[in-house]
A protein has these predicted regions:
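Short recognition helix of helix-turn-helix/winged-helix DNA-binding domains
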Residues: 1-57, 80, 84-151
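C-terminal terminal-subdomain/extension
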Residues: 152-153, 159
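Conserved small/polar residues in nucleotide/adenosyl-binding loops
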Residues: 166-173
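Short amphipathic alpha-helical interaction segments
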Residues: 60-74, 159-165
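Alpha-helix C-caps/helix-loop-beta hinges
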Residues: 78-79, 168
Length: 173
């Protein structure tokens, strides 16, 4: 996708609260949405159809279904994003404006577009899990000092088996 002109900034900032309170797939979706947001106001009017295209999945994954909230509802539930529907006063013409809260010093991660360019072929959940791990690293490093694994699970809101699945060496290694 490097050859494709995408409306992305070179990097974005994400609140650790946003990262840690969404599931893995939604973390990556939010990261991609933030890449399209204005760097000062953190606002974007990217459509869910556009976002699905950037992430490489179907639009249906963003809609409410039996037993799951829509992507927008999940974002709202974090308290980190204000979502407004804007009506253009024309028939069948409206759009959604997303405004992410400004990040708090020491409680965010700066994530480059390089992450998108390099890892966009990995499984969506794995991309989100990498971002979740990144959110618990020491500032300006990639060192995770949380131990035992139970503390990590609690911090990133993930189950024990999932953490072990992604952090333990493969039997094939």
């Amino acid at each position: 996708m490097k050859d494709t002109k995408l409306p992305f900034k070179e990097y974005t900032v994400m609140s650790n609260n946003l990262i840690q309170n969404l599931n893995c797939s939604d973390v990556y979706r939010a990261y991609t949405l933030l890449l399209t947001a204005d760097k000062d106001s953190l606002e974007t009017n990217t459509t869910l159809k556009q976002l699905a295209g950037f992430v490489g999945e179907e639009l249906d994954n963003y809609k409410k279904s039996k037993g799951t909230l829509s992507f927008n509802d999940k974002l709202r539930a974090t308290g980190e994003v204000v979502i407004r529907d804007i009506d253009s006063k024309q028939k069948d013409r409206h759009w959604t404006m997303y405004r992410f809260n400004q990040v708090e010093p020491g409680n965010y991660r700066r994530i480059g577009r390089e992450f998108y360019d390099t890892y966009n072929t990995l499984d969506l959940k794995l991309r989100g899990f990498i971002l979740k791990l990144f959110s618990v690293t020491e500032p300006h490093s990639h060192v995770i000092k949380l131990s035992p694994i139970r503390k990590l699970e609690k911090r990133i809101h993930m189950g024990h088996d999932t953490c072990l699945l992604y952090t333990s060496p493969s039997p094939r290694d």
